[in-house]
């Protein structure tokens, strides 16, 4: 089943919903970073969250970055997303893997840790990006984002994120949703939705059964006048280039760049988001020194 993201409303706009199936997207990210099972679940949840949240951006030039650092062996997860639904991300330690938790599930919280913060950074081309930050609530990512929305944006929200890792380490199913109550929404409605979310199967279970994202949302919001407003194809896509990596190399400063040049060797840099390697010869390092630091 192709990945798909939809935006919807229910109950005459009292509820705003973004839902997605992200199996292929997550599989691509997990393969690029060669993730162990628990690391795959952590990165996959963050990538799914990024895809969902990125579509709330107003301009295609805007970016949304999610960071979670909890002091655990995952060594943090970073995801950057865009308005068109494409995302990229990385986990500090792709080999992070521990025993399943007491429910027999991959222990994402156990590798993320709970001693740290979740950051949401919106760069809208202004002088300074908007940064929202909350302490990690559980380390399971979905609950942390729901806590962020409630505390930092004063929007009561439910966030469901799921990643099912197969025995061959490929992603069997992945997806998620963000459900938000709009100002003035009926409190009884919020209670009803909370009850339904407790009763439904996990999102990965529903995706594995072949349900589309529309069918999943119709199941949750039965008799609530669900209206699909927009459909987007999310994907994992890195926009790195030799020019960007060259600027990153130049940004380390003249002194460090001169040391690299004086060693007389080539310099290899890898993109954090896709692991693509960029090699700069000794002469090219010299050219960068000349172009960025010579006195004009």
From Swiss-Prot:
What does the entry list under GO cellular component? Answer: cytoplasm
SS bond partners: 238-240, 271-274
* Pfam families xrefs: HSP33
The superkingdom listed in its UniProt entry is: Bacteria
> Is the keyword Glycoprotein in the record?
no
InterPro entries reported for this sequence: Heat_shock_Hsp33, Heat_shock_Hsp33_C, Heat_shock_Hsp33_N
Posttranslational mods: Under oxidizing conditions two disulfide bonds are formed involving the reactive cysteines. Under reducing conditions zinc is bound to the reactive cysteines and the protein is inactive.
UniProt entry keywords in alphabetical sequence: Chaperone, Cytoplasm, Disulfide bond, Redox-active center, Zinc
Mind telling me which Gene3D superfamilies this protein's record contains? Answer: Hsp33 domain, HSP33 redox switch-like
Q: Respond yes or no to whether keyword Metal-binding is given for this record.
A: no
For this UniProt entry, the molecular function terms from Gene Ontology, in alphabetical order, are: protein folding chaperone; unfolded protein binding
Location in or out of the cell: Cytoplasm
GO BP of this protein: protein refolding
Function statement: Redox regulated molecular chaperone. Protects both thermally unfolding and oxidatively damaged proteins from irreversible aggregation. Plays an important role in the bacterial defense system toward oxidative stress.
The UniProt entry's sequence similarity note says: Belongs to the HSP33 family.
Q: What is this protein called?
A: 33 kDa chaperonin
Organism of origin is: Clostridium botulinum (strain Langeland / NCTC 10281 / Type F)
Q: What is the lineage of its organism?
A: Bacteria, Bacillati, Bacillota, Clostridia, Eubacteriales
């Amino acid at each position: 089943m192709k990945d798909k993201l939809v935006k919807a409303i229910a109950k005459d706009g009292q509820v705003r919903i973004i839902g997605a199936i992200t199996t292929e997207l997550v599989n691509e990210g997990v393969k690029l970073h060669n993730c162990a099972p628990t690391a795959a679940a952590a990165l996959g949840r963050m990538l799914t969250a990024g895809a969902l949240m990125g579509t709330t951006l107003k301009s295609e030039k805007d970016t949304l970055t999610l960071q979670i650092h909890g002091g655990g062996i995952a060594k943090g997860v970073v995801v950057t997303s865009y308005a068109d639904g494409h995302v990229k991300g990385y986990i500090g330690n792709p080999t992070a893997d521990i025993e399943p938790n007491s429910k027999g599930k991959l222990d994402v919280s156990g590798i993320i840790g709970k001693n740290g913060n979740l950051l949401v950074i919106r760069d809208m081309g202004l002088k300074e990006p908007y940064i929202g930050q909350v302490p990690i609530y559980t380390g399971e990512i979905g609950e942390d984002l729901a806590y962020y929305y409630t505390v930092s944006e004063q929007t009561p929200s439910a966030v469901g994120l799921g990643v099912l890792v197969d025995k061959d380490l490929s992603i069997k199913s992945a997806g998620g949703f963000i459900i938000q109550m709009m100002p003035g929404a009926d409190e009884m409605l919020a209670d009803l939705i909370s009850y339904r979310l407790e009763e439904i199967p996990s999102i990965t279970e529903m995706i594995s059964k072949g349900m589309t994202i529309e069918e999943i949302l119709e199941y949750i919001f039965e008799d609530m006048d669900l209206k699909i407003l927009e459909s987007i194809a999310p994907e994992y896509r890195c926009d790195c280039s030799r020019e960007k990596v060259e600027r990153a190399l130049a940004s380390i400063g003249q002194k460090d760049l001169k040391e690299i040049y004086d060693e007389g060797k080539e310099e290899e840099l890898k993109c954090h988001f896709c692991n693509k390697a960029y090699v700069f010869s000794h002469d090219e390092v010299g050219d960068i020194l000349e172009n960025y630091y010579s006195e004009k």
